[in-house]
C-alpha cells in the first residue's frame, strides 16, 4: 500500500480489517484529476484484485461522505491486477452497477437489474427475455454497463445478450394469465351492470337492430382523450413508451419524400425541460398539407409512441395526433400611458454576452405597447442601423446608447499631495483586512501600520477588530485570520481613533490605497470621525508607472521580484511591513531614474500618459439625445477602439467630456462608479460622483443577487437597502432615479443560452466571475436578466412602496424617453466622393473609346445605348463610382495585370468603353478594326458575338472583329437606372494590396476604410460550447436538446473582421463619423487599415463601396504572359483547339482512360470541378454562348439539378434554350413579345427565388402574358423552381478568363503546368509527384479508396486535385523533376526543357521565409554540410532530414569538420 493511498484511507477512516485484506496489499493512487470549476475529483486506484463487494461499497460510501462535507463530488475507478470472474462476485457487481449513474435510469434498472449473468468464452452473458433484447437497450444502455463494470475493476468486457426462452415463456404466461383474469373480471362486471340496467329499463315491445359501429364517434372520443390527456415533461422520458403527449415549441423542421412518394416530417420540439426528436408520416400530398402547422416557431400538442429510431439510435416520437396550441405569452398588462421604458438592454452585438437580435428586442417592446426602448450594447453601436430601421417599421422610438468602459485619463500615485521631501519625511505604511469588498456591508477585522523613516521601521500599530459575528470560510481562506485571532479584540471605534492618532502628521502609504482609504473613510463617516486628509501614496500605482514592463503589480508578485519577505500575505501587519520595504526600493529607483525627490513630483513627473491602460474600468450608459450627440457617439466609439483600446475599448473621462454635447449619461449597473461608491465609500462619496451623470440607474433586486453570493452584499434586505441608498443619492444630487432591467435575453427560459455562452469564455473572462480562490473557485451565478414587463418591474420594486415604485419604474423612464429626439442613424441618400469633372471625364472616355471602335458618327444602336446609360449614370451621381473604378483598373493594367469583372457591371456598355470590364453587353455584332463598319444581330438568334462565323468587312476586306453578349443595362442599375451600382473587380492576388493602396492615394487616408464585418458564433461552434458545458458542469443532454441549446446560443457577436476586398470611401466634403464609427479588425491595433464599425452592408447604400478582390485568374494570366510573351488580349475566344477540350481529350494527345476523364477540363477555371465536368459530359457545349449557359447553370441554385438537367435529358429543351443566366430571361421574354418592364420584373422575381412567394394574382398575370406570347409551359415551370441565378456578365467575364488559360493548356502546355502549380495548386507531395506515373496513379487510387470510405482528409482531397494535373502532364510526355538545392526557386516552378523543377515552398513544412532564406544563402556560397544548411539556410533538422531522404542533398556530410583519417584517403 502506497503512503499516499494510506493517507487517504486514514482521512476517510476506512476500517482496519478491510485495509489489511490482500486486495489492499499493493493499493495505490494512480492519478487524481481535479476539476476546479465543477468541484469534481476523479480518483484512479490500483488494487491487487477486484474488491469484495462489501469492501467496495464501504470504500465508495466513505469517500463520498468525507468529500461531501467539503462540498466536493467524487468519482473513482479501479484497475485490478487480477480479475475474479466467479458467478457470485460478478452477479453482485452486476447488480451494484444499477446503483450508479447512468445505469440507474428507471427503464434500464427495472428491465435488467434482476437478470442473471455468467462469464463464458471471455464474454459476459446476460440471459434476458426476448422483449428486452432489443436495439434500444443494446445501443443506449449496455455501453454504460460496460463502462461501469470497467470502473469496478473488471476491465473492458464484451457483453452479449441471449434470449432465455424459458424466462420469456414464463413471463409471457404470467402476463397472459394476468390479462385473462382482468378480462374475465371486466366481463363479469359488465354483465352484472347490464343486468342492473335492464331491470331499470321499460320493457321492449319489439326487437331493434344492433347498433352499427360509429367510427366518427370513436375518432371523437380519441380526440377528446387527446385534448384532456396528461402532458408529460420531455425530461421525464428515458425509454420507449406509448401514447405519450408533449406540448412544446418546434425549433427545427425537415421534410423529405421517399422513393415511394410518402412524406416524412422530421422535427424537433422543446418544452424547455428538454427537447425531443419527432417524426410524422404522410401518405400523400393531401395528407401532408394537413400538417402545415408543423413549422418552426409553432407551439403544438402532439401524441405518439416513443420508439428508438433505427438510424439515429435515439428515442423518437412517432406522432399520431398533432394540434396547434396557443402559447401563454407574457404581456404587459398596465394600461396605455402607464407602461415603462426599458433603458438598459443588450442585443447579440454585446460580445459573447447577450442573445436577442435588436429586431426581436424592439418587436417585443412594441408588442407590449412600450413607447420607446433603448439599445445599450457593451462598448459598441453595431446594432444601431438594424435598430433604426426596425423601430421605424414598428412605430416605436429607439433610444440609441451604449454601455461604455470609462477610465480616468491619469490614475494618481498620490492623493492630496503637498510639498514634502519623500526621503526625509516620516511615512505611515498601512494595510487593512476586511470581511469583503463593500465598506457598507462588510467589516474591518484588522488594521496594521508601520512608521518608517529612511527605510527603517520606527514604530508599529497592529490591532484586530471584533466584527460581532463569526468569519466566513472565504474570509479565513483569503486573510488567514480566524475567529481565534479576534477573541478579545477591541471595538471598531476604539481602534479607529487609535489609528488616527498613530498616523497623524505622516504620509499614508498603502498598496491599492484607493480601496483602503475608501473603506477607512466610510467607517470614519459612520462613526462621526474625521476623514483622511493627509497625503496618501498608492504603491500599486507607483509600481505600475515605475515598472510598466512588469505584467503583474500585486503585492505578492512585487515582493517576490524584489526579494522582500512576505510570510503571511493578506494579514495586515505583514502586508504593511512589506509595503514599506517596497516603498523604500521604489523611492530609490524613482530618484535615480527619474530625479523624483518631492511628493508633488509623483503625479506630475511619473504618471504615464497611457496610465489609462491600467486604470480600473467603470461602466456608464451613454445615450444619444440628438443628431449632434449621434456624431459625438460615433467619435467616442471610434476613439475608444482606435486610440484608447487596451483589452477592451476605453473612454477616458476627459475624452468623454470633450464630446458630451448631445449625450446623456446614466450610472449603469453594479460595475458603475456610483454603485461601487455606495458599496465601498459611502453615500457622501457616491453623491459627489453622481453629480457627473444625468440620472441614477437602479435595477431589480434579482439583477444584484449574484453580489450576495460574492459576499459584497449580505442578503436580500441588503440589496433593497443599496437600492434605497441609490435613491437617496439621486435625491441629494438632484438627479432622477430610473429603474432599468439590464436586459440580456427576452424570455426567462433563455437564461441557459447566456449561461452556455458566458461559461465558454473560461475563468479568465471578466464577465465569467468566480467565487473563491484557486482550485476551489466556483463560477458566480449570472443574474436573471430577461426583458421584464411593467408589472414585473413594479413587483420587483414593491418594497419601495407603490408610489415610489411607479415613479422610478414608469414615470421617470417615460420622462427620460421624452427628452430624446428622433435621430437619423442611417442616411437616406447615397453620398459619393467628389472627383473634379467626374461627369465630363466619364462621358469623354466613353465616347472617345466608342468612336475609336465603332466610328464617328456612332451606329444608332450604340449611340442610343450610351445616351441611355449616361443619362442614368450622370443623373444619379454615379459618375464618380465609374471613374474611381476606371482609375483603379487602369493603374493595375499599367502594372501589367488584367482585371476581371464580377457581378453585373459587364451589363453596362459605358463600363466596357471606359475599361472597367472586358464584357461587351451589346447584341452580338461584327465591327471592322480598320474602317469601323459594323453589323448587329438583334433578333436573338445568336447568343454571343464570339460564336459568329469569321468573315471580312464588306467595305475594306479586313477581317471583322466579333463581340457582344446581349445583356440589358437594366440588370445592373435597375429598370429605372437609379439602383446604386455595385462594381466588383477581380484583381490579381499579387496586385490586390497595391490596388487597395491606390484607393487611399486617390481619395485620401482619412476617407478610405476597409469594409467592416461582424463575426458571430456559428451553430457548429455553439454546439462545441454546449458539449463543453455538459463536460464541465456534469450535465447530460439528449441530442435534440443539444441542438436546441446550440441554436439558442448561436448568432452572438464573437469578433469583428473585414471584407476581403471591400473598401468604403467617405465623401471628402463630409467625415466618416457622419456615417459610422471606425475601429481595427478583430481589435488588432497593429493592423494597417481601419474598418467601418458598422457591418458594411448596413451603409452600402449611403457611401461608395469598392470591391477590390484578389483572384487567381489575373495572376495566372500574368504568369503565362511572362512565360510566353503572348498578350492575353490577343487570344481568340473561339479557338478551335480550346473548344475541342469540351468534347474530348484528343487535342491533348491522350485518351480519356489515361487521365481519368472524358474531356480536357482538368485545371480549367470554372470548368475543372467534378460537378461542372459532369455537366459538360451531359451537355457537350460547342459555343461560347453554351459555355455561358453552363457557367450560369453551375452557379445558380435549383437552376440545373431538378430543372434544366431534366429538361435536357428528356429532350424537352437544349443547353441553348434552357434558362441559364438571369439576364437571359429578360432578353428572351422581350424577343418573345413581352413589354420590357414586365420582362424585367419577371426576371427579378425569378432570380431572387420569389416566383412562388408572390401573390397568386401577380404570378398568374405574368403567366398569362407569357402564354399569350407563346412562351412554352416548360419554361414557365422552370421559372418556378429557381432560387438564385448568376448574372450573365459575371459568367462572360469568368468564361473569357478561363478560355485564355485553356489556350495555353492546348498550345503551350509546359507553361500552363508551370503556372498552374505555381498559383493554383493547394497541396503537394513531392516524393509522389517526382516519382513517375506509377507512383502518382497509386497515390490517386489510395485517396480514391479513402474518399469512398469518407476517410480522406482535406489535404488529401486537395492533393488529389493536384495529382490529377500531374498525371495529365506526365501522360502528355512532360516530366516532373526533383527539388534541386541549387536550381529550384523559392516560390515559383521552373521550366527546364520538358521538365518542371519544383520550388522549395512545395516541400511540406517549408514556409516562404525559409525558402527565400535558402535561395539567398546559396547565392553566398555552396552548402558544405547539413549543419551549414540548417544554420545559413534556416532549415529545421526535420526539413533537412526530409531533403536527405528524398535524395536532394546527395552525399552532403553532417558537418564540414574533416576527420583526422580523411587525410590518408
From Swiss-Prot:
<keyword id="KW-0808">Transferase</keyword>
<keyword id="KW-0269">Exonuclease</keyword>
<dbReference type="InterPro" id="IPR013520">
    <property type="entry name" value="Exonuclease_RNaseT/DNA_pol3"/>
</dbReference>
<dbReference type="InterPro" id="IPR036397">
    <property type="entry name" value="RNaseH_sf"/>
</dbReference>
<dbReference type="InterPro" id="IPR028112">
    <property type="entry name" value="DNA_PolC-type_N_I"/>
</dbReference>
<dbReference type="InterPro" id="IPR012340">
    <property type="entry name" value="NA-bd_OB-fold"/>
</dbReference>
<dbReference type="Pfam" id="PF07733">
    <property type="entry name" value="DNA_pol3_alpha"/>
</dbReference>
<dbReference type="InterPro" id="IPR024754">
    <property type="entry name" value="DNA_PolC-like_N_II"/>
</dbReference>
<dbReference type="InterPro" id="IPR006054">
    <property type="entry name" value="DnaQ"/>
</dbReference>
<dbReference type="InterPro" id="IPR011708">
    <property type="entry name" value="DNA_pol3_alpha_NTPase_dom"/>
</dbReference>
<keyword id="KW-0239">DNA-directed DNA polymerase</keyword>
<dbReference type="InterPro" id="IPR029460">
    <property type="entry name" value="DNAPol_HHH"/>
</dbReference>
<dbReference type="InterPro" id="IPR004805">
    <property type="entry name" value="DnaE2/DnaE/PolC"/>
</dbReference>
<keyword id="KW-0540">Nuclease</keyword>
<dbReference type="Pfam" id="PF14579">
    <property type="entry name" value="HHH_6"/>
</dbReference>
<dbReference type="InterPro" id="IPR040982">
    <property type="entry name" value="DNA_pol3_finger"/>
</dbReference>
<dbReference type="GO" id="GO:0006261">
    <property type="term" value="P:DNA-templated DNA replication"/>
</dbReference>
<keyword id="KW-0378">Hydrolase</keyword>
<dbReference type="Pfam" id="PF00929">
    <property type="entry name" value="RNase_T"/>
</dbReference>
<dbReference type="GO" id="GO:0005737">
    <property type="term" value="C:cytoplasm"/>
</dbReference>
<keyword id="KW-0963">Cytoplasm</keyword>
<dbReference type="GO" id="GO:0003887">
    <property type="term" value="F:DNA-directed DNA polymerase activity"/>
</dbReference>
<dbReference type="InterPro" id="IPR044923">
    <property type="entry name" value="PolC_middle_finger_sf"/>
</dbReference>
<comment type="function">
    <text>Required for replicative DNA synthesis. This DNA polymerase also exhibits 3' to 5' exonuclease activity.</text>
</comment>
<dbReference type="GO" id="GO:0003677">
    <property type="term" value="F:DNA binding"/>
</dbReference>
<keyword id="KW-0235">DNA replication</keyword>
<dbReference type="InterPro" id="IPR006308">
    <property type="entry name" value="Pol_III_a_PolC-type_gram_pos"/>
</dbReference>
<protein>
    <recommendedName>
        <fullName>DNA polymerase III PolC-type</fullName>
        <ecNumber>2.7.7.7</ecNumber>
    </recommendedName>
</protein>
<dbReference type="InterPro" id="IPR016195">
    <property type="entry name" value="Pol/histidinol_Pase-like"/>
</dbReference>
<dbReference type="Pfam" id="PF14480">
    <property type="entry name" value="DNA_pol3_a_NI"/>
</dbReference>
<dbReference type="Pfam" id="PF02811">
    <property type="entry name" value="PHP"/>
</dbReference>
<dbReference type="Pfam" id="PF17657">
    <property type="entry name" value="DNA_pol3_finger"/>
</dbReference>
<keyword id="KW-0548">Nucleotidyltransferase</keyword>
<comment type="similarity">
    <text>Belongs to the DNA polymerase type-C family. PolC subfamily.</text>
</comment>
<dbReference type="InterPro" id="IPR012337">
    <property type="entry name" value="RNaseH-like_sf"/>
</dbReference>
<dbReference type="InterPro" id="IPR004013">
    <property type="entry name" value="PHP_dom"/>
</dbReference>
<dbReference type="InterPro" id="IPR003141">
    <property type="entry name" value="Pol/His_phosphatase_N"/>
</dbReference>
<feature type="domain" description="Exonuclease">
    <location>
        <begin position="431"/>
        <end position="583"/>
    </location>
</feature>
<dbReference type="GO" id="GO:0008408">
    <property type="term" value="F:3'-5' exonuclease activity"/>
</dbReference>
<dbReference type="Pfam" id="PF11490">
    <property type="entry name" value="DNA_pol3_a_NII"/>
</dbReference>
Amino acid at each position: 500500500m502506497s503512503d499516499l493511498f494510506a493517507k487517504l484511507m486514514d482521512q476517510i477512516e476506512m476500517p482496519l480489517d478491510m485495509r489489511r485484506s490482500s486486495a489492499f496489499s499493493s493499493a495505490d493512487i494512480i492519478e487524481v484529476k481535479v476539476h476546479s470549476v465543477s468541484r469534481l475529483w476523479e480518483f484512479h486506484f490500483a488494487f491487487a484484485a477486484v474488491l469484495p463487494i462489501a469492501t467496495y461499497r464501504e470504500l465508495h460510501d466513505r469517500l463520498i461522505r468525507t468529500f461531501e462535507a467539503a462540498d466536493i463530488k467524487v468519482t473513482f475507478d479501479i484497475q485490478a491486477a487480477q480479475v475474479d470472474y466467479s458467478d457470485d462476485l460478478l452477479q453482485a457487481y452486476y447488480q451494484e452497477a444499477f446503483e450508479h449513474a447512468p445505469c440507474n435510469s428507471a427503464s434500464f434498472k427495472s428491465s435488467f437489474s434482476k437478470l442473471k449473468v455468467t462469464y463464458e468464452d471471455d464474454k459476459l452473458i446476460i440471459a434476458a427475455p426476448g422483449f428486452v433484447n432489443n436495439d434500444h437497450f443494446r445501443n443506449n444502455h449496455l455501453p454504460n454497463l460496460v463502462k461501469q463494470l470497467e470502473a469496478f475493476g473488471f476491465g473492458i468486457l464484451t457483453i452479449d445478450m441471449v434470449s432465455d426462452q424459458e424466462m420469456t415463456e414464463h413471463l409471457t404466461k404470467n402476463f397472459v394469465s394476468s390479462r385473462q383474469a382482468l378480462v374475465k373480471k371486466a366481463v363479469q362486471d359488465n354483465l352484472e351492470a347490464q343486468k342492473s340496467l335492464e331491470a331499470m329499463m321499460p320493457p321492449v315491445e319489439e326487437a331493434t337492430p344492433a347498433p352499427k359501429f360509429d367510427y366518427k364517434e370513436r375518432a371523437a372520443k380519441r380526440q377528446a382523450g387527446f385534448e384532456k390527456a396528461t402532458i408529460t415533461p420531455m425530461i421525464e422520458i428515458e425509454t420507449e413508451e406509448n401514447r405519450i403527449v408533449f406540448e412544446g415549441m418546434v425549433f427545427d423542421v425537415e421534410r423529405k419524400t421517399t422513393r415511394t412518394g410518402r412524406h416524412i416530417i422530421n422535427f424537433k420540439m422543446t418544452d424547455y425541460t428538454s427537447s425531443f426528436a419527432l417524426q410524422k408520416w404522410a401518405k400523400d400530398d393531401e395528407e401532408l398539407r394537413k400538417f402545415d402547422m408543423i413549422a418552426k416557431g409553432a407551439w403544438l400538442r402532439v401524441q405518439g409512441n416513443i420508439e428508438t429510431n433505427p438510424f439515429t439510435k435515439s428515442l423518437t416520437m412517432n406522432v399520431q395526433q398533432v394540434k396547434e396550441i396557443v402559447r401563454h405569452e407574457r404581456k404587459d398588462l398596465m394600461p396605455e400611458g402607464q407602461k415603462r421604458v426599458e433603458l438598459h438592454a443588450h442585443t447579440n452585438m454585446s460580445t459573447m454576452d447577450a442573445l436577442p437580435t435588436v429586431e426581436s428586442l424592439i418587436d417585443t417592446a412594441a408588442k407590449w405597447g412600450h413607447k420607446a426602448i433603448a439599445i445599450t450594447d457593451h462598448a459598441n453601436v453595431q446594432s444601431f442601423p438594424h435598430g433604426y430601421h426596425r423601430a421605424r417599421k414598428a412605430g416605436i422610438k429607439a433610444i440609441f446608447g451604449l454601455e461604455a468602459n470609462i477610465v480616468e485619463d491619469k490614475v494618481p500615485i498620490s492623493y492630496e499631495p503637498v510639498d514634502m521631501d519623500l526621503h526625509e519625511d516620516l511615512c505611515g505604511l498601512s494595510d487593512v483586512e476586511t470581511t469583503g469588498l463593500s465598506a457598507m456591508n462588510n467589516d474591518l477585522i484588522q488594521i496594521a501600520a508601520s512608521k518608517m523613516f529612511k527605510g527603517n521601521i520606527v514604530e508599529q500599530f497592529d490591532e484586530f477588530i471584533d466584527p460581532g459575528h463569526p468569519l466566513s470560510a472565504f474570509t479565513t481562506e483569503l486573510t488567514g485570520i480566524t475567529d481565534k485571532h479576534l477573541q478579545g479584540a477591541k471595538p471598531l471605534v476604539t481602534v479607529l481613533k487609535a489609528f488616527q492618532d498613530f498616523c497623524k502628521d505622516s504620509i499614508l502609504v498603502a498598496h491599492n490605497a484607493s480601496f483602503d482609504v475608501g473603506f477607512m473613510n466610510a467607517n470614519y463617516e459612520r462613526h462621526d470621525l474625521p476623514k483622511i486628509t493627509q497625503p496618501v501614496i498608492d504603491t500599486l500605482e507607483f509600481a505600475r508607472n515605475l515598472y510598466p514592463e512588469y505584467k503583474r503589480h500585486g503585492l505578492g508578485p512585487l515582493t517576490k521580484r524584489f526579494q522582500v519577505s512576505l510570510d503571511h500575505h493578506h494579514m495586515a501587519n505583514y502586508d504593511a511591513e512589506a509595503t514599506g520595504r517596497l516603498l523604500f526600493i521604489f523611492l530609490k529607483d524613482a530618484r535615480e531614474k527619474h530625479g523624483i525627490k518631492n511628493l508633488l513630483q509623483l503625479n506630475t513627473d511619473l504618471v504615464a500618459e497611457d496610465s489609462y491602460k491600467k486604470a480600473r474600468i467603470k461602466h456608464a450608459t451613454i445615450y444619444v439625445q440628438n443628431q449632434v450627440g449621434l456624431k459625438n457617439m460615433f467619435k467616442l466609439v471610434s476613439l475608444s477602439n482606435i486610440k484608447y483600446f487596451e483589452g477592451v475599448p476605453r473612454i477616458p473621462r476627459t475624452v468623454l467630456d470633450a464630446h458630451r454635447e448631445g449625450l446623456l449619461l446614466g450610472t449603469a449597473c453594479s460595475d458603475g462608479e456610483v454603485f461601487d461608491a455606495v458599496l465601498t465609500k459611502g453615500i457622501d462619496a457616491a453623491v459627489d460622483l453622481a453629480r457627473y451623470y444625468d440620472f441614477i440607474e437602479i435595477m431589480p433586486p434579482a439583477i444584484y443577487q449574484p453580489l450576495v453570493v460574492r459576499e459584497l452584499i449580505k442578503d436580500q434586505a441588503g440589496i433593497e437597502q443599496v437600492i434605497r441608498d441609490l435613491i437617496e443619492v439621486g435625491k441629494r444630487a438632484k438627479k432622477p432615479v430610473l429603474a432599468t432591467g439590464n436586459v440580456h435575453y427576452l424570455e426567462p427560459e433563455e437564461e441557459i443560452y447566456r449561461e452556455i455562452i458566458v461559461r465558454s469564455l473560461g475563468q479568465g473572462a471578466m464577465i465569467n466571475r468566480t467565487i473563491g480562490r484557486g482550485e476551489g473557485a466556483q463560477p458566480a451565478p449570472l443574474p436573471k436578466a430577461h426583458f421584464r414587463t411593467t408589472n414585473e418591474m413594479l413587483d420587483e420594486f414593491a418594497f419601495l412602496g407603490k408610489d415610489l415604485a411607479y415613479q422610478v419604474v414608469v414615470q421617470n423612464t417615460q420622462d427620460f424617453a421624452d427628452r430624446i429626439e428622433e435621430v437619423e442613424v442611417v442616411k437616406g441618400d447615397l453620398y459619393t466622393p467628389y472627383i473634379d469633372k467626374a461627369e465630363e471625364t466619364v462621358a469623354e472616355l466613353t465616347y472617345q473609346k466608342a468612336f475609336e471602335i465603332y466610328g464617328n458618327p456612332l451606329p444608332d444602336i450604340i449611340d442610343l445605348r450610351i445616351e441611355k446609360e449616361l443619362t442614368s449614370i450622370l443623373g444619379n451621381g454615379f459618375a464618380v463610382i465609374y471613374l474611381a473604378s476606371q482609375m483603379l483598373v487602369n493603374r493595375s493594367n499599367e502594372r501589367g495585370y488584367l482585371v476581371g469583372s464580377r457581378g453585373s457591371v459587364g451589363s453596362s456598355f459605358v463600363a466596357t468603353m471606359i475599361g472597367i470590364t472586358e464584357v461587351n453587353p451589346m447584341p452580338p455584332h461584327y465591327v471592322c478594326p480598320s474602317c469601323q463598319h459594323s453589323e448587329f444581330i438583334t433578333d436573338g438568334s445568336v447568343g454571343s458575338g464570339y460564336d459568329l462565323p469569321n468573315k471580312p468587312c464588306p467595305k475594306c476586306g479586313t477581317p471583322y472583329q466579333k463581340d457582344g453578349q446581349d445583356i440589358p443595362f437594366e440588370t445592373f442599375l435597375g429598370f429605372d437606372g437609379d439602383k446604386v451600382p455595385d462594381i466588383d473587380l477581380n484583381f490579381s492576388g499579387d496586385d490586390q494590396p497595391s490596388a487597395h493602396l491606390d484607393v487611399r492615394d486617390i481619395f485620401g487616408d482619412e476617407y478610405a476604410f476597409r469594409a467592416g464585418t461582424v463575426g458571430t458564433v456559428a451553430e457548429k461552434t455553439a454546439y462545441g460550447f454546449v458539449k463543453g458545458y455538459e463536460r464541465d458542469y456534469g450535465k447530460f443532454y439528449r441530442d435534440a436538446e443539444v441542438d436546441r441549446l446550440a441554436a439558442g446560443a448561436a448568432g452572438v457577436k464573437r469578433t469583428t473582421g473585414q471584407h476581403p476586398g471591400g473598401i468604403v470611401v467617405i465623401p471628402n466634403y463630409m467625415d466618416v463619423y457622419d456615417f459610422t464609427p471606425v475601429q481595427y479588425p478583430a481589435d488588432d491595433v497593429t493592423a494597417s487599415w481601419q474598418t467601418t464599425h458598422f457591418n458594411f452592408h448596413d451603409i452600402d447604400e449611403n457611401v461608395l463601396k469598392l470591391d477590390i478582390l484578389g483572384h487567381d485568374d489575373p495572376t495566372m494570366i500574368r504568369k503565362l504572359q511572362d512565360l510566353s510573351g503572348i498578350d492575353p488580349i490577343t487570344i481568340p475566344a473561339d479557338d478551335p483547339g480550346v473548344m475541342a477540350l469540351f468534347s474530348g481529350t484528343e487535342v491533348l494527345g491522350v485518351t480519356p482512360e489515361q487521365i481519368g476523364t472524358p474531356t480536357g477540363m482538368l485545371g480549367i477555371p470554372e470548368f475543372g470541378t467534378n460537378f461542372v465536368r459532369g455537366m459538360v459530359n451531359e451537355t457537350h457545349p460547342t459555343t461560347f454562348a453554351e459555355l455561358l449557359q453552363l457557367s450560369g447553370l453551375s452557379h445558380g441554385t435549383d437552376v440545373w439539378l431538378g430543372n434544366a438537367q431534366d429538361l435536357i435529358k428528356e429532350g424537352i429543351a437544349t443547353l441553348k434554350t434552357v434558362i441559364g443566366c438571369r439576364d437571359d430571361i429578360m432578353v428572351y421574354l422581350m424577343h418573345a413579345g413581352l413589354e420590357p418592364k414586365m420582362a424585367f420584373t419577371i426576371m427579378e422575381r425569378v432570380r431572387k427565388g420569389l416566383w412562388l412567394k408572390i401573390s397568386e394574382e401577380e404570378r398568374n398575370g405574368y403567366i398569362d402574358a407569357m402564354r399569350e406570347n407563346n412562351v412554352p409551359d416548360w419554361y414557365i415551370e422552370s421559372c418556378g423552381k429557381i432560387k438564385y441565378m448568376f448574372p450573365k456578365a459575371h459568367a462572360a467575364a469568368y468564361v473569357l478568363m478561363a478560355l485564355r488559360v485553356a489556350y495555353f493548356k492546348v498550345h503551350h502546355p509546359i507553361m500552363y503546368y508551370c503556372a498552374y502549380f505555381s498559383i493554383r495548386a493547394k497541396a503537394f507531395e513531392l516524393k509522389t509527384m517526382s516519382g513517375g506515373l506509377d507512383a502518382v496513379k497509386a497515390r490517386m487510387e489510395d485517396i480514391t479508396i479513402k474518399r469512398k470510405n469518407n476517410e480522406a482528409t482535406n489535404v488529401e482531397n486537395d492533393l488529389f486535385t493536384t495529382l490529377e494535373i500531374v498525371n495529365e502532364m506526365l501522360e502528355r510526355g512532360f516530366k516532373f523533376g526533383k527539388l534541386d538545392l541549387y536550381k529550384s526557386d523559392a516560390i515559383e516552378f521552373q521550366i527546364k526543357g520538358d521538365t518542371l523543377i519544383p520550388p522549395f515552398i512545395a516541400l511540406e513544412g517549408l514556409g516562404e521565409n525559409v525558402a527565400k532564406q535558402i535561395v539567398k544563402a546559396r547565392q553566398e556560397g555552396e552548402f558544405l554540410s547539413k549543419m551549414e544548411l540548417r544554420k545559413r539556410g534556416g532549415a529545421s533538422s526535420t526539413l533537412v532530414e526530409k531533403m536527405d531522404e528524398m535524395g536532394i542533398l546527395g552525399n552532403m556530410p553532417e558537418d564540414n569538420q574533416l576527420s583526422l583519417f580523411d587525410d590518408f584517403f
